[in-house]
Each structure stands twice: as structure tokens, then as C-alpha cells.
């Protein structure tokens, strides 16, 4: 007899034994089918046929387990996996073989997850699991036959149990664990029956699979999955019954699916998810609950999955994490409730999904998040109610969507749940949905709840894509204001671009080439470059106090010169702060032309038009918010007041007291007329108002007592202080002469002068209380006399005037009248760093005879503390900026070079200023260098004669 015939006979005998054992097992389980077993031997024994220990396909036992791997044959073979130890779980991952056989191998462990791949045949195959037993469990594979076989798990018992599967009949096929493939795997349940429950999963295909839960009956439920298809999947939930129920969620698919969850039952409920697929899965165990709680890890698809465990609840709670698909999925379980709570997270599709379950309520609630599709979806939980609540959340479509309440049966991808309660009173159900929030589909981010609105961004300008002239400006402390701008002239736009380039380029102090300026002009307008350059130069001179001069006519290079120079200045437009003061004059002009008040949004629009609000903010202005709300307001150039009866609150700008003092409306009107290329009389109302103010000022100058915001009595009373009758001034009637000695009065006056000079750099008003705190409270009786003495010293010695800034608050400030020729042209400035040694180098070259060897200049810098490597950087920068030029020394071997003054140095400073600088450093007089002094005098005379012929860009206006 051949070996094949012997093996066939042995298999037939094993199949016959398994059939006999299966019939006896059916008779034994039939009485207990309708409900739970009467006796529970222990905590490790399954509590019912719907226990997760049976449904997961593995049996826990206290003793050792034995696994026998069958030999593959031509016919279908069946393998029964052995039991494992306590607290161990196993998931079977099948592999495909050529023969029709199924093999499951479980490795026993103590708390670890074991996966054994069974062999899947092309034909029908059978996979049977064993029930848990307290004793030794022995598993033996049956004999395969040519017919399909059916395996039935054994009944758990206290002793040793042996499970032999019977021979399969010609009836329906059994459960096969799916093979993980590139697509998501799916398990499908069968219809309900009165027999024991046998989960039979199908072979996974690359396409979509279908999950159909069984219809529960009064007996034990049996789930038999149908064949997976690539079409549309529709899971149908079972009806509620009094016995235990089994719920299995649908698996992910690439198509759209409709899922209807089962209604909640009065008994215990256990939920199970399918086996993991190819992707990674992360599951967090559930927290402890007062009742029985079962948590099953989700099935991982191709994308990562994150499952958050449910919070403890008062009753029985079953939490089933989602089954991730190709996209990212995040599931947040429900919060604790007093009653029974069942939460089933969504089944994500290809796109990311974010699900937030409802807040806790007093009654029992069932919450089902939406099923994610290709797009992203964000669902917001409702507010908690007193009674049972029902939360219906939408499914995510292909585009970003917001959370709305869909009607059941509208179409696929609709998931809804009913309220689970004992009385099932629909009138007590409340549905509360907050305002929907739309999320971006391009951002893959996990969110556990709705995020708050973004905080206001100061000085933010938002432009509408559909309407280019419509912008939204966020001011200092106001909400967003929508403004419709007038269309900008293309010529003015080119002028603004060129203006921005000139200001930024000037920070580096490098000469500006004409070719570089042409690059910032649109090609269609480059033929009008002279007109654009003329307008930009006019803006530079009027607003920023810079003069555009031609440095080299042959190379066509230009530089910017600060116009705050050699002539005495009067008023605000000639102040040393330069560009900031020019910007302030624009703000004052806007306020004056707008009716002596301007809203914050209008000021922001004007600054935006000037380029201050762009992303490339100029360091020449610093922080625009600080410039408006801190510097100009604190210095009392501007007043910042809220608009009355306006919601939301808006603010307006007005002229401050310092602006009324340091300038006039006529000067501001002429300045604005120069900017807009108009005549001051083009604004007749403002022009008449400015004339009336000038007449009032002229009339007030003839009186000793001046009105508000005018120069006080200090200017007129300063000459009377020296005479014995000086106390006959405005204070003679109020305050009697004091008995203080003259020396003490002079000492207090000098201290007061030091205070004013110290506070002059901050431009902050000095109140009377602060002055008395500094010089002493005892000086309050002689305070007017001390002010007169200090005003006389400041006027005659320092060239400044002490004026009353605010008579009501008794605050004072200095009005500076110093001439710019008394200060150096080239000084250290935060806007022009790197000039710390420029005046030293230029003075050294002039003292050395207008030229100095390169080695001598480096030795001079080394004497000033400059490091060896940095002296080369300093001289190279001055050479490139044309402050100095390098000439080769004739007949020098090796070749040597000497430095001389460059064209920029001759424009920005003079030899007399350099000589005075050296004399101040060495504590000498300029005449101590007679040769250099005579040369400096001749240079001053030549500058006076040819000053109007120095490299000007002609015909600006």
C-alpha cells in the first residue's frame, strides 16, 4: 500500500472522530443557548459566547499549551490553534500558500501579543479556535478531506479538554482569517443562529471589503462573513435583544460607506474590531471603571492610527477605537457618564479625521463620530444636557467641511446614533451643536477640540484676493477695520518702490547706481525714469529730510545726504530726528486736512501707503506701534482718545500741545501742498483756519501773558531777571521776596538746568512735582524765581528756551534752537552703524597733510584699541563707501598706498569741523595747528562761494 493511501485512511478516521465529538458538543450547549451560563467557574473562564476571549480566536488557560502544526496536503486541511496562558492575546495573520490549507500557530506568553500566520488555500478552508479551560489543553489538527470542513470550538470546562474538529459538510464555508494586503483588510460577520458563535473572517483583497454584522437572536449569535468584494460596503446593525450582543464596526475602504450602529441593549455589550492590517497601530488601554469595561485595539490600515482610551464611567462601558485607513486618524473617547455609555469612533478613509466625542451628561448616551472620507473633517461636541443626548455628526467629504446635523438617509457616508436609555423618551433628547469651524484640508494635524480664534495682530494689513483695493487694517487696540482704497497711480507706485529702495540702500552707505534704481521700475515706465527720480527725490527731501546728490557723474552714482545741516532750523520740519519728524509732519497734516482729527484706521492707511506697514519695515522708523502710541503720544506731539458712543471702541488722533508749540498750521499746510504738488489755497477751509491762527499768534506776541500752548513769560521775563526789580513780574503780586541767600538760589538754579538738559534727550514733559522732587520740596515758595534763573541760563548759554507745555498740569519742556553747524555732521547713529572711527580717521588724514600712509592709519587705529584683523575691515568699508580714497605712492618698492579724503567725506563734513574735533579731543584750540587752520579757513570760504554748484540733481520741483 502506498504512503498516500495510508495518509488518506488516517485522515478519514480523524474526521469521523471529530464529527462525533461535534455532535455531542452541540447537544451539551443547546440548553444554555438562550442566555448566559448558570455557573461561572472562575474569572478566567469566558462569561458568555459573546466574550472577547472567544471572539478573538484565542483561549486563555492556566496550564501549559501544546501546539501541533499539521502537514500540508493536496486536500483542505484544518488546524486548531492551542490555548495560551493567562492575560495573553493572539491575533492571527494569514499567509497564502499554494495548497488549500489553513494553519494557525499561537505562541503562549504572559501579557504579550502573539501573531501566528495561518496558511490560506485557494479553495475553501476552515479555522477553528478552542475555548478556554482551567486545566491542560491539548490541541490536535484533524484529518483533512477532499470536502470542505467545518471546525467548532470546544466547550470550556474545568478539566482537560481536547478539541477535534469534525469533518466538513457540503454546506456553507467557514471563517478564514484575512491575508494582509496593500489594501485595508475587512472581516464580515454572518447571520445569526441559535448555535454557538463562530467568527469566520474572509480573505482580504486589494479592493474594498464589506462588513455585515449579524442579527442577534435570543440564543448565541454566530457571525459568518461573506466574500469580500470591491464594491460598496453597507454594514447593517442587529436589532437590540435581551441577551448579550456583539457589535463589529465596518472596516475602512476606499469607497464611501454607510454605517448604522446597533441600538443599545439593556444587557452587557462587547464590541470587537477586525484584525490589524499592514499599517501600524497604537492603542491605549482603557482606564478602570466601576463596571465591566472591554476595550479592543483598532485595526491598523496603511496609515498610522492613534487610539485614546475612554475615561472611567459609572456603569458598563465599551470603547472601540477606530479602524484607520490610508490617512491619519485620531479618536477621542467620551467622558465619564453616570449611566451606560457606548462609544464607537469613526472609520477613517484616505484623509485625516478628527473626532471629538460629546461631553458627559447625567443620563446614558451613545455617541458615534462621523466616518472620514477623502477629505478632512472636524466635529465639535455638543454641550452636556440633563437628559439623554443624541449626537449626530457628519461625514467628511472630499473638501474641508464644517460640523452640521445631517438628516438620516440622505446618502452614503452618513452615520447617526440613537440615545441609549432605559425609558427611551425621545422628548428629553437634546441636540446642541456649537458654531462650526472650518479647517484646512492641507494641514494634517490632530485636534482634540475646537481651537479658539487667533489673537489680534497689531498693524496687520490683509488684502482681499478678489478685490485688490479692499484691505483690512488692524490698528493699535481696535478690531479689524475694512477699508476700500482708491486705485493707486502706476507712476506713484513706481515712485514708492524707488523710494523704498533708496531708503534701504542708504543704510549700507554704499553709492547707489542708476542701473540698480532702474531695476525697481516696471519695464513699461523705465523710459520715464527722470520724472520718477524727480518725484522720489522730492519725497526724500520733504518727508525724510534727505537730499539726493550725484556722487560721480561718469559712473552715475548717487548718495543721500541729511539736510538737517548747516543752517539754523526753526520748527518741527528741521528737527534733528529727521525722518521720524518728517513722518510726524505727514500725520499732523493728515489730521489737519481731515478736520483736526483722524481715526486710527485712516492713519494706518496713510502709513501703509508710505510703505511703513509692509513686511520689509524700515529700521529708520523703528517699530511703528511704538512710534505712534509711545514716542509721539508720550512726547505730546499727538493725543490719542477713544471715540465716544462707538462699538467696538475706536480711537482718534489729535494734535498734541507740543505740536501746537513747535509748529503752525500754515507750515503744515505748506508742507502738505509741497507733498501733493498743490497750492495751500487749494484747501480754502484749512487755509483760512491757518491764517486765523497766524493772526492770533501775532496778536498774542504783543502781550506779556500768552495763551495756551504758546511760549510763556520766560522769554520776555528773562531780560528783567538781572535787574533789582525783576520780582515785579507776574509773580510779584503772589509771592513776596524770600530771605534765601543768592548763593543758594544760584545753586538750585544750576541743579534745575542740569535736570532740564538731562530730560531734553527723552523729549518727555517735566511736571512741577517732578522738579520739586529733584531740587527739594522747600523750593516751592521760590519756584518762579528758580525757573526765571534757569530759563536765562538755558537761553544764553545753551541756545534753548524753557517753555510751558501744559499750563493746566504745570509741565515744562525745552525748545531747542541750536544751529547744526555747531555739531558734527558725521556722528554715531543707530541708523548708520560702523562710523565709530570715521571722524578719527578723517581728522588724522587732515592733520597728517591731507594724506596718510596705509600703515600709519592702521597704526593709529591700533592705538585706539582696534584689533589687527578689524582695521582692514574698517578701511575697506570706508573705501567702498567713498569716504576715503587710496592712491599709490610713486616710486615705492614694495608698492605702498596712502589714504586721502573721498568725495563723500568732502560732502558730509569740512576741514574746519575735523580740526575742531581734534582740538576738542586734545583740549586745545584750532589755532594751535596754524597751517591746518589757514587751510580750513580757505576751505570754508570756497564752500560759501561754490556751495550752490555741488553735484545737485537739478529741477526737482
From Swiss-Prot:
Its main location: cytoplasm. Pfam families: MAGE. The keyword Ribosomal protein does not apply. It comes from the Eukaryota. InterPro entries: MAGE, MAGE_WH1, MAGE_WH2, MHD_dom. Gene3D superfamilies: MAGE homology domain, winged helix WH1 motif, MAGE homology domain, winged helix WH2 motif. GO terms for cellular component: dendrite; nucleus; perinuclear region of cytoplasm; plasma membrane; postsynaptic membrane. PROSITE patterns: MAGE. Keywords: Cell membrane, Cytoplasm, Membrane, Nucleus, Repeat, Tumor antigen, Ubl conjugation pathway. PANTHER family: MELANOMA-ASSOCIATED ANTIGEN E1, MELANOMA-ASSOCIATED ANTIGEN MAGE ANTIGEN. May enhance ubiquitin ligase activity of RING-type zinc finger-containing E3 ubiquitin-protein ligases. Proposed to act through recruitment and/or stabilization of the Ubl-conjugating enzyme (E2) at the E3:substrate complex. This is Melanoma-associated antigen E1. It comes from Macaca fascicularis (Crab-eating macaque).
